[in-house]
Design a protein with these regions (language model features):
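Non-catalytic, substrate/partner-engaging modules appended to enzymatic cores
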Residues: 1-179
Length: 179
């Protein structure tokens, strides 16, 4: 059966399938947000924002819903680098945004024919995912560069869950397949 085939794989590879699909959905939501002209670096009403701790680590356990009453304060926190606007990593217990971003998140989920319970897999419980939120932008830390005769070296660090290939594409302005 398909469950036996997946169960035969290492557990980290099993979860990679789930995380890849969640990332695909996240990227669809992010693309729609950009297409609608919504900022990714500033909040709009209904956005879920994640504050950072004093060490700069996202506090996913303390999401803040952006409302008309708190939008100015939330925007100040984001401008100061103490919080980030997020998008859904869809799962069984996902907190979805409200307002226009909530509409986008729900549309992507609906267009893909998904329900929250689809991320609970009784036959493979370790592949179940509760979901969460991911920052729409990530800070690039410790960036440095060096020109040499034989090429160019770019050094940087990214928070966990972010991909250097995506950042490199922005620097190189070429498709990842061309690297």
């Amino acid at each position: 059966t398909w469950t036996e085939a997946i169960d035969a794989m290492p557990s980290n590879l099993q979860m990679m399938f789930v995380h890849a699909y969640q990332s695909y959905l996240f990227n669809e939501m992010l693309s729609m947000r950009i297409e609608r002209g919504l900022p990714i670096n500033m909040p709009v009403e209904g956005d879920v924002v994640i504050p950072l701790d004093p060490n700069g680590n996202p506090q996913h356990e303390n999401p803040v819903m952006t409302t008309a009453k708190n939008i100015d304060l939330v925007a100040r926190q984001i401008r100061a680098g103490r919080a980030f606007v997020t998008g859904a990593l869809f799962g069984s217990d996902s907190i979805l945004a409200e307002g226009e971003m909530g509409e986008i998140e729900r549309k992507v989920i609906e267009d893909n024919g998904l329900k929250a319970e689809d991320f609970v897999i009784p036959g493979l419980p370790r592949c179940s995912s509760k979901g969460g939120r991911r920052e729409l932008m990530c800070p690039v830390k410790s960036i440095g560069s060096e020109f040499r005769e034989d090429g160019y070296t770019l050094r940087f660090s990214l928070p966990k869950g972010n991909y250097a290939t995506c950042l490199m594409r922005e620097f190189m302005k070429s498709e990842m397949r061309d690297y």
